[in-house]
Amino acid sequence: MQEDTVNDLKMIQEWFETNRVRETGIVENVQKQPASPERDEMLEICKGNIEEFSMMIQLVASIIEREK
């Protein structure tokens, strides 16, 4: 049971990592666009998402350590 839980948590962690990388790519593309209020808003949203994904990755990593 514990091994299944750890595997599930690792899958969740990978999902957060994949989305963090995706959001980082969006930020890189958006930064190339001309400055505008919409661009700035998109950057703030994506940067907030990256921060949240990073926190979730750390949280899941700590849960995985506890489950081992």
Please name every model-derived segment.
Residues 4, 8, 41-59:
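Alpha-helical oligomerization interfaces
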Residues 1, 36, 45:
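Residue-level detector of functional hotspots within protein domains
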Residues 16, 20, 39, 53-54:
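Generic alpha-helix initiation/capping and coil-helix boundary signal
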Residues 29-40:
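Charged, low-complexity interaction regions
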Residues 1-29, 59-65:
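N-terminal acidic leader/helix
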